Protein backbone atom coordinates (compact mmCIF):
# COMPACT_ATOMS: atom_id res chain seq x y z
CA UNK A 1 0.00 0.00 0.00
CA UNK A 2 1.81 3.08 -1.27
CA UNK A 3 1.15 6.43 0.39
CA UNK A 4 -0.64 7.69 -2.72
CA UNK A 5 -2.70 4.53 -3.32
CA UNK A 6 -6.48 4.26 -3.01
CA UNK A 7 -6.04 1.18 -0.78
CA UNK A 8 -3.97 3.21 1.69
CA UNK A 9 -6.72 5.83 1.89
CA UNK A 10 -9.37 3.19 2.63
CA UNK A 11 -7.07 1.56 5.20
CA UNK A 12 -6.65 4.89 7.01
CA UNK A 13 -10.37 5.70 6.85
CA UNK A 14 -11.40 2.41 8.47
CA UNK A 15 -8.58 2.73 11.00
CA UNK A 16 -9.65 6.22 12.10
CA UNK A 17 -13.33 5.22 12.38
CA UNK A 18 -12.49 2.19 14.55
CA UNK A 19 -9.99 4.24 16.58
CA UNK A 20 -12.54 6.81 17.73
CA UNK A 21 -15.51 4.45 18.11
CA UNK A 22 -15.08 0.72 18.81
CA UNK A 23 -11.55 0.88 20.30
CA UNK A 24 -11.81 4.10 22.33
CA UNK A 25 -10.65 2.34 25.49
CA UNK A 26 -7.86 0.29 23.85
CA UNK A 27 -6.64 2.54 21.07
CA UNK A 28 -2.98 1.59 21.26
CA UNK A 29 -3.85 -2.08 20.67
CA UNK A 30 -5.69 -1.17 17.47
CA UNK A 31 -2.67 0.88 16.35
CA UNK A 32 -0.39 -2.12 16.92
CA UNK A 33 -2.67 -4.36 14.85
CA UNK A 34 -2.91 -1.74 12.09
CA UNK A 35 0.87 -1.32 12.07
CA UNK A 36 1.56 -5.02 11.63
CA UNK A 37 -1.22 -5.42 9.06
CA UNK A 38 0.24 -2.55 7.05
CA UNK A 39 3.75 -3.98 7.20
CA UNK A 40 2.59 -7.51 6.41
CA UNK A 41 0.68 -6.20 3.37
CA UNK A 42 4.02 -5.36 1.75
CA UNK A 43 5.46 -8.84 2.38
CA UNK A 44 4.37 -11.01 5.28
CA UNK A 45 7.81 -12.69 5.45
CA UNK A 46 9.42 -9.38 6.38
CA UNK A 47 7.50 -9.35 9.67
CA UNK A 48 10.11 -11.85 10.90
CA UNK A 49 12.85 -9.20 10.72
CA UNK A 50 10.67 -6.55 12.33
CA UNK A 51 9.92 -8.92 15.20
CA UNK A 52 13.57 -9.95 15.52
CA UNK A 53 14.78 -6.35 15.90
CA UNK A 54 11.94 -5.63 18.33
CA UNK A 55 12.62 -8.68 20.51
CA UNK A 56 16.40 -8.09 20.60
CA UNK A 57 16.18 -4.44 21.66
CA UNK A 58 13.23 -4.97 24.02
CA UNK A 59 15.00 -7.80 25.86
CA UNK A 60 18.28 -5.90 26.08
CA UNK A 61 16.47 -2.79 27.30
CA UNK A 62 14.76 -4.70 30.12
CA UNK A 63 18.08 -6.23 31.21
CA UNK A 64 19.86 -2.86 31.10
CA UNK A 65 17.18 -1.36 33.34
CA UNK A 66 18.38 -3.56 36.19
CA UNK A 67 21.21 -2.68 38.58
CA UNK A 68 24.45 -4.26 37.36
CA UNK A 69 28.12 -3.44 36.95
CA UNK A 70 29.22 -1.12 34.15
CA UNK A 71 31.20 -3.74 32.19
CA UNK A 72 28.23 -6.09 32.04
CA UNK A 73 25.94 -3.29 30.86
CA UNK A 74 28.43 -2.43 28.14
CA UNK A 75 28.64 -6.04 26.96
CA UNK A 76 24.85 -6.34 26.82
CA UNK A 77 24.31 -3.16 24.81
CA UNK A 78 27.20 -4.04 22.49
CA UNK A 79 25.82 -7.53 21.85
CA UNK A 80 22.29 -6.25 21.22
CA UNK A 81 23.46 -3.51 18.86
CA UNK A 82 25.68 -6.00 17.04
CA UNK A 83 22.72 -8.31 16.43
CA UNK A 84 20.50 -5.36 15.54
CA UNK A 85 22.87 -4.03 12.89
CA UNK A 86 23.95 -7.50 11.76
CA UNK A 87 20.45 -8.06 10.39
CA UNK A 88 20.64 -4.73 8.54
CA UNK A 89 24.19 -5.34 7.35
CA UNK A 90 23.62 -8.84 6.00
CA UNK A 91 20.42 -7.98 4.16
CA UNK A 92 21.54 -4.61 2.79
CA UNK A 93 25.28 -4.92 2.15
CA UNK A 94 26.12 -8.59 1.49
CA UNK A 95 25.79 -8.37 -2.30
CA UNK A 96 27.79 -5.12 -2.32
CA UNK A 97 30.58 -6.90 -0.42
CA UNK A 98 30.47 -9.94 -2.73
CA UNK A 99 30.57 -7.72 -5.82
CA UNK A 100 33.68 -5.90 -4.59
CA UNK A 101 35.43 -9.15 -3.61
CA UNK A 102 34.74 -10.50 -7.11
CA UNK A 103 36.12 -7.33 -8.69
CA UNK A 104 39.28 -7.20 -6.59
CA UNK A 105 40.15 -10.91 -6.66
CA UNK A 106 38.55 -11.73 -10.03
CA UNK A 107 36.25 -14.11 -8.21
CA UNK A 108 32.97 -15.63 -9.24
CA UNK A 109 31.02 -15.75 -5.98
CA UNK A 110 27.29 -15.81 -6.68
CA UNK A 111 25.17 -12.94 -5.43
CA UNK A 112 22.70 -13.85 -2.70
CA UNK A 113 20.13 -11.35 -4.05
CA UNK A 114 18.58 -10.90 -0.62
CA UNK A 115 15.39 -8.85 -0.54
CA UNK A 116 15.67 -5.85 1.75
CA UNK A 117 12.60 -5.53 3.99
CA UNK A 118 10.86 -2.18 3.63
CA UNK A 119 11.81 0.34 6.29
CA UNK A 120 14.56 -1.86 7.79
CA UNK A 121 17.04 1.01 8.13
CA UNK A 122 14.45 3.22 9.81
CA UNK A 123 13.19 0.83 12.46
CA UNK A 124 16.71 -0.48 13.09
CA UNK A 125 17.98 3.02 13.84
CA UNK A 126 14.88 3.88 15.87
CA UNK A 127 15.20 0.80 18.09
CA UNK A 128 18.98 1.27 18.44
CA UNK A 129 18.42 4.86 19.58
CA UNK A 130 15.97 3.65 22.23
CA UNK A 131 18.45 1.05 23.47
CA UNK A 132 21.28 3.58 23.77
CA UNK A 133 18.99 5.96 25.66
CA UNK A 134 18.22 3.17 28.14
CA UNK A 135 21.94 2.34 28.39
CA UNK A 136 22.83 5.98 29.09
CA UNK A 137 19.88 6.16 31.52
CA UNK A 138 18.18 8.92 29.56
CA UNK A 139 14.95 6.93 29.56
CA UNK A 140 13.40 4.00 31.40
CA UNK A 141 12.97 0.72 29.58
CA UNK A 142 9.46 -0.11 28.38
CA UNK A 143 8.30 -3.21 30.28
CA UNK A 144 5.24 -3.89 28.13
CA UNK A 145 6.48 -5.74 25.04
CA UNK A 146 3.45 -4.88 22.92
CA UNK A 147 3.64 -1.16 23.68
CA UNK A 148 7.31 -1.23 22.73
CA UNK A 149 6.45 -3.18 19.56
CA UNK A 150 4.07 -0.35 18.62
CA UNK A 151 6.84 2.23 19.10
CA UNK A 152 9.11 0.32 16.69
CA UNK A 153 6.41 -0.53 14.13
CA UNK A 154 4.18 2.58 14.11
CA UNK A 155 2.99 2.20 10.54
CA UNK A 156 2.92 5.76 9.12
CA UNK A 157 6.64 6.27 9.75
CA UNK A 158 8.04 2.77 9.34
CA UNK A 159 8.71 3.05 5.60
CA UNK A 160 10.50 6.41 5.34
CA UNK A 161 10.68 8.02 8.76
CA UNK A 162 10.89 10.32 10.55
CA UNK A 163 13.12 8.36 12.95
CA UNK A 164 11.25 8.65 16.24
CA UNK A 165 12.61 9.09 19.76
CA UNK A 166 11.10 6.97 22.51
CA UNK A 167 10.63 9.81 25.00
CA UNK A 168 8.68 11.90 22.47
CA UNK A 169 6.67 9.22 20.67
CA UNK A 170 5.91 6.29 22.99
CA UNK A 171 3.94 8.24 25.62
CA UNK A 172 1.59 9.52 22.91
CA UNK A 173 0.21 6.00 22.51
CA UNK A 174 -0.95 5.99 26.14
CA UNK A 175 -4.42 6.94 27.33
CA UNK A 176 -7.43 7.76 25.19
CA UNK A 177 -7.32 10.23 22.33
CA UNK A 178 -10.61 12.01 21.90
CA UNK A 179 -11.85 13.01 18.48
CA UNK A 180 -10.67 16.57 17.82
CA UNK A 181 -11.57 18.37 14.61
CA UNK A 182 -8.36 20.40 14.84
CA UNK A 183 -6.26 17.23 14.53
CA UNK A 184 -8.36 16.02 11.61
CA UNK A 185 -8.07 19.34 9.78
CA UNK A 186 -4.33 19.67 10.38
CA UNK A 187 -3.83 16.05 9.37
CA UNK A 188 -5.81 16.42 6.15
CA UNK A 189 -3.93 19.63 5.32
CA UNK A 190 -0.61 17.85 5.63
CA UNK A 191 -1.84 14.84 3.65
CA UNK A 192 -3.19 16.98 0.78
CA UNK A 193 -0.06 19.15 0.70
CA UNK A 194 2.13 16.05 0.74
CA UNK A 195 0.14 14.44 -2.09
CA UNK A 196 0.42 17.69 -4.05
CA UNK A 197 4.20 17.67 -3.67
CA UNK A 198 4.49 13.99 -4.54
CA UNK A 199 2.01 13.72 -7.41
CA UNK A 200 2.08 17.15 -9.05
CA UNK A 201 5.65 18.22 -8.37
CA UNK A 202 7.79 15.11 -7.86
CA UNK A 203 6.11 12.75 -10.34
CA UNK A 204 6.28 15.25 -13.20
CA UNK A 205 9.86 16.22 -12.38
CA UNK A 206 10.77 12.51 -12.17
CA UNK A 207 9.62 11.82 -15.73
CA UNK A 208 11.71 14.76 -16.93
CA UNK A 209 14.76 13.59 -14.94
CA UNK A 210 14.41 10.02 -16.23
CA UNK A 211 14.40 11.18 -19.85
CA UNK A 212 17.65 13.08 -19.31
CA UNK A 213 19.67 10.70 -17.16
CA UNK A 214 18.67 7.46 -18.84
CA UNK A 215 20.26 9.01 -21.93
CA UNK A 216 22.75 11.34 -20.25
CA UNK A 217 25.43 10.77 -22.91
CA UNK A 218 22.99 11.80 -25.64
CA UNK A 219 21.66 14.79 -23.71
CA UNK A 220 24.97 15.71 -22.07
CA UNK A 221 24.19 19.43 -22.36
CA UNK A 222 21.11 19.04 -20.18
CA UNK A 223 22.85 17.98 -16.96
CA UNK A 224 22.15 21.36 -15.34
CA UNK A 225 18.45 21.17 -16.21
CA UNK A 226 18.37 17.57 -15.06
CA UNK A 227 19.98 18.14 -11.68
CA UNK A 228 17.74 21.15 -10.99
CA UNK A 229 14.71 19.02 -11.83
CA UNK A 230 16.09 16.26 -9.62
CA UNK A 231 16.41 18.65 -6.69
CA UNK A 232 12.71 19.43 -7.16
CA UNK A 233 11.79 15.76 -7.55
CA UNK A 234 13.73 14.59 -4.51
CA UNK A 235 12.42 17.29 -2.22
CA UNK A 236 8.85 16.92 -3.48
CA UNK A 237 8.86 13.15 -3.13
CA UNK A 238 10.65 12.84 0.20
CA UNK A 239 9.21 15.84 2.04
CA UNK A 240 5.80 15.16 0.49
CA UNK A 241 5.91 11.61 1.80
CA UNK A 242 6.82 12.89 5.26
CA UNK A 243 3.91 15.35 5.11
CA UNK A 244 1.53 12.48 4.33
CA UNK A 245 3.02 10.39 7.14
CA UNK A 246 2.76 13.21 9.67
CA UNK A 247 -0.75 14.01 8.47
CA UNK A 248 -1.90 10.42 8.93
CA UNK A 249 -0.44 10.41 12.44
CA UNK A 250 -2.31 13.62 13.25
CA UNK A 251 -5.58 11.87 12.36
CA UNK A 252 -4.88 9.52 15.27
CA UNK A 253 -3.76 12.35 17.58
CA UNK A 254 -0.08 11.38 17.27
CA UNK A 255 2.47 14.13 16.52
CA UNK A 256 5.63 13.03 14.71
CA UNK A 257 8.87 15.01 14.61
CA UNK A 258 9.40 17.48 11.78
CA UNK A 259 11.81 16.07 9.20
CA UNK A 260 12.18 18.93 6.70
CA UNK A 261 12.40 22.65 7.36
CA UNK A 262 12.90 24.64 4.13
CA UNK A 263 16.24 22.93 3.30
CA UNK A 264 16.84 24.93 0.12
CA UNK A 265 16.97 28.12 2.21
CA UNK A 266 20.04 26.78 4.04
CA UNK A 267 23.11 29.05 4.20
CA UNK A 268 25.68 26.26 4.52
CA UNK A 269 25.95 22.50 4.13
CA UNK A 270 25.86 22.20 7.93
CA UNK A 271 22.66 24.27 7.99
CA UNK A 272 21.26 22.15 5.14
CA UNK A 273 21.64 19.01 7.25
CA UNK A 274 19.86 20.78 10.11
CA UNK A 275 16.91 21.18 7.74
CA UNK A 276 17.04 18.06 5.53
CA UNK A 277 16.09 14.66 6.98
CA UNK A 278 16.35 16.30 10.39
CA UNK A 279 15.73 13.16 12.44
CA UNK A 280 18.55 11.28 10.68
CA UNK A 281 20.89 14.19 11.38
CA UNK A 282 19.96 14.42 15.06
CA UNK A 283 20.24 10.63 15.38
CA UNK A 284 23.76 10.73 13.94
CA UNK A 285 24.68 13.66 16.18
CA UNK A 286 23.46 12.05 19.41
CA UNK A 287 24.46 8.43 18.81
CA UNK A 288 27.54 8.70 16.56
CA UNK A 289 29.08 12.19 16.56
CA UNK A 290 29.07 12.79 20.32
CA UNK A 291 30.32 9.29 21.26
CA UNK A 292 33.16 9.64 18.72
CA UNK A 293 34.01 13.20 19.80
CA UNK A 294 34.05 12.27 23.50
CA UNK A 295 35.89 8.97 23.07
CA UNK A 296 39.29 8.36 24.63
CA UNK A 297 41.13 8.02 21.32
CA UNK A 298 39.64 11.27 20.07
CA UNK A 299 40.78 12.98 23.26
CA UNK A 300 44.33 11.74 22.67
CA UNK A 301 44.20 12.90 19.06
CA UNK A 302 43.01 16.32 20.20
CA UNK A 303 46.00 16.70 22.52
CA UNK A 304 48.42 15.78 19.73
CA UNK A 305 46.85 18.12 17.18
CA UNK A 306 46.89 21.01 19.67
CA UNK A 307 50.64 20.56 20.09
CA UNK A 308 51.21 20.50 16.32
CA UNK A 309 48.67 23.04 15.01
CA UNK A 310 47.97 25.21 18.04
CA UNK A 311 44.98 25.35 20.37
CA UNK A 312 42.26 26.53 17.95
CA UNK A 313 43.12 24.34 14.96
CA UNK A 314 44.06 21.44 17.21
CA UNK A 315 40.65 21.53 18.86
CA UNK A 316 38.86 21.76 15.50
CA UNK A 317 40.63 18.93 13.65
CA UNK A 318 39.16 16.07 15.75
CA UNK A 319 35.67 17.57 15.29
CA UNK A 320 36.25 17.68 11.53
CA UNK A 321 37.34 14.03 11.54
CA UNK A 322 34.25 13.09 13.55
CA UNK A 323 32.04 14.91 11.02
CA UNK A 324 33.65 13.08 8.10
CA UNK A 325 33.13 9.72 9.84
CA UNK A 326 29.51 10.61 10.58
CA UNK A 327 28.77 11.50 6.97
CA UNK A 328 30.60 8.44 5.74
CA UNK A 329 28.03 6.51 7.78
CA UNK A 330 25.24 8.70 6.35
CA UNK A 331 26.39 7.69 2.88
CA UNK A 332 26.48 4.00 3.78
CA UNK A 333 23.01 4.35 5.32
CA UNK A 334 21.62 5.70 2.04
CA UNK A 335 22.59 2.64 0.04
CA UNK A 336 25.00 -0.19 -0.74
CA UNK A 337 27.08 1.41 -3.48
CA UNK A 338 30.30 3.42 -3.79
CA UNK A 339 28.34 6.39 -5.10
CA UNK A 340 26.60 6.71 -1.72
CA UNK A 341 29.92 6.51 0.09
CA UNK A 342 31.20 9.28 -2.20
CA UNK A 343 28.03 11.26 -1.46
CA UNK A 344 28.60 10.96 2.28
CA UNK A 345 32.29 11.85 2.06
CA UNK A 346 31.51 14.84 -0.15
CA UNK A 347 29.21 16.29 2.52
CA UNK A 348 31.51 15.33 5.39
CA UNK A 349 34.62 16.85 3.81
CA UNK A 350 32.84 20.13 3.01
CA UNK A 351 31.58 20.39 6.59
CA UNK A 352 35.00 19.40 7.97
CA UNK A 353 36.95 21.86 5.81
CA UNK A 354 34.41 24.60 6.58
CA UNK A 355 35.07 24.04 10.27
CA UNK A 356 38.81 24.37 9.75
CA UNK A 357 38.40 27.58 7.74
CA UNK A 358 35.94 29.29 10.10
CA UNK A 359 38.55 31.76 11.35
CA UNK A 360 39.77 32.45 7.81
CA UNK A 361 36.20 33.12 6.62
CA UNK A 362 35.74 35.63 9.40
CA UNK A 363 38.96 37.44 8.44
CA UNK A 364 38.06 37.49 4.73
CA UNK A 365 34.66 39.02 5.46
CA UNK A 366 36.27 41.73 7.57
CA UNK A 367 38.87 42.56 4.91
CA UNK A 368 36.26 42.65 2.15
CA UNK A 369 33.88 44.69 4.38
CA UNK A 370 31.11 42.12 4.02
CA UNK A 371 28.26 42.53 6.48
CA UNK A 372 27.36 38.94 7.54
CA UNK A 373 23.76 39.94 8.32
CA UNK A 374 23.13 41.76 5.03
CA UNK A 375 20.44 40.46 2.68
CA UNK A 376 22.88 40.30 -0.21
CA UNK A 377 25.34 38.09 1.65
CA UNK A 378 22.49 35.95 2.99
CA UNK A 379 21.25 35.40 -0.57
CA UNK A 380 24.79 34.60 -1.71
CA UNK A 381 25.07 31.94 1.02
CA UNK A 382 21.76 30.36 -0.02
CA UNK A 383 22.77 30.22 -3.71
CA UNK A 384 26.24 28.87 -2.87
CA UNK A 385 24.76 26.15 -0.66
CA UNK A 386 22.14 25.24 -3.26
CA UNK A 387 24.91 24.77 -5.85
CA UNK A 388 26.92 22.55 -3.49
CA UNK A 389 23.82 20.50 -2.65
CA UNK A 390 22.99 20.00 -6.32
CA UNK A 391 26.50 18.74 -7.00
CA UNK A 392 25.94 16.13 -4.29
CA UNK A 393 22.71 15.04 -6.03
CA UNK A 394 24.80 13.94 -9.03
CA UNK A 395 26.15 11.06 -6.93
CA UNK A 396 22.60 10.09 -6.00
CA UNK A 397 21.34 10.21 -9.60
CA UNK A 398 24.26 8.45 -11.27
CA UNK A 399 24.75 4.70 -11.42
CA UNK A 400 28.45 4.94 -10.51
CA UNK A 401 30.95 7.43 -9.09
CA UNK A 402 32.61 7.65 -12.51
CA UNK A 403 29.31 8.52 -14.15
CA UNK A 404 28.66 11.20 -11.52
CA UNK A 405 32.06 12.78 -12.20
CA UNK A 406 31.44 12.76 -15.98
CA UNK A 407 28.11 14.46 -15.34
CA UNK A 408 29.89 17.05 -13.19
CA UNK A 409 32.31 17.78 -16.04
CA UNK A 410 29.40 18.10 -18.48
CA UNK A 411 27.65 20.39 -16.01
CA UNK A 412 30.37 23.04 -16.38
CA UNK A 413 31.59 22.39 -19.94
CA UNK A 414 28.45 21.63 -21.96
CA UNK A 415 25.27 23.64 -22.13
CA UNK A 416 22.64 22.76 -24.71
CA UNK A 417 18.98 23.08 -23.78
CA UNK A 418 17.69 22.83 -27.35
CA UNK A 419 16.31 19.26 -26.82
CA UNK A 420 13.84 20.78 -24.34
CA UNK A 421 12.43 23.12 -26.97
CA UNK A 422 12.66 21.06 -30.16
CA UNK A 423 11.01 18.09 -28.44
CA UNK A 424 13.78 15.56 -29.17
CA UNK A 425 14.01 14.60 -25.51
CA UNK A 426 10.37 13.43 -25.70
CA UNK A 427 10.57 11.83 -29.14
CA UNK A 428 9.54 8.45 -27.71
CA UNK A 429 6.42 9.86 -25.99
CA UNK A 430 3.15 9.83 -28.03
CA UNK A 431 1.68 13.34 -28.22
CA UNK A 432 4.87 14.74 -26.75
CA UNK A 433 4.13 18.38 -27.67
CA UNK A 434 1.07 18.55 -25.41
CA UNK A 435 2.77 16.34 -22.83
CA UNK A 436 5.82 18.62 -22.72
CA UNK A 437 3.85 21.79 -22.00
CA UNK A 438 1.57 20.14 -19.45
CA UNK A 439 4.57 18.71 -17.64
CA UNK A 440 6.49 22.00 -17.60
CA UNK A 441 3.39 23.84 -16.41
CA UNK A 442 2.85 21.33 -13.57
CA UNK A 443 6.49 21.62 -12.46
CA UNK A 444 6.42 25.43 -12.66
CA UNK A 445 3.13 25.89 -10.80
CA UNK A 446 4.00 23.21 -8.25
CA UNK A 447 7.40 24.77 -7.57
CA UNK A 448 5.86 28.24 -7.24
CA UNK A 449 3.29 27.02 -4.70
CA UNK A 450 5.87 25.14 -2.63
CA UNK A 451 8.32 28.07 -2.80
CA UNK A 452 5.66 30.53 -1.61
CA UNK A 453 4.62 28.33 1.32
CA UNK A 454 8.26 27.63 2.23
CA UNK A 455 9.06 31.35 2.11
CA UNK A 456 6.20 32.13 4.51
CA UNK A 457 7.37 29.40 6.88
CA UNK A 458 10.94 30.70 6.65
CA UNK A 459 9.61 34.08 7.76
CA UNK A 460 8.12 32.38 10.83
CA UNK A 461 4.51 32.32 9.67
CA UNK A 462 2.34 29.31 10.49
CA UNK A 463 0.60 28.73 7.16
CA UNK A 464 -1.39 25.76 8.48
CA UNK A 465 -2.71 27.74 11.47
CA UNK A 466 -3.66 30.64 9.19
CA UNK A 467 -5.50 28.31 6.82
CA UNK A 468 -7.38 26.71 9.72
CA UNK A 469 -8.49 30.16 10.92
CA UNK A 470 -10.12 30.88 7.55
CA UNK A 471 -13.81 29.85 7.36
CA UNK A 472 -14.14 26.45 5.69
CA UNK A 473 -16.19 27.76 2.75
CA UNK A 474 -13.43 30.28 1.85
CA UNK A 475 -10.58 27.75 1.72
Identify the meaning behind each predicted range.
Residues 1-451, 457-475:
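Membrane-embedded transmembrane alpha-helical bundles that form the catalytic cores
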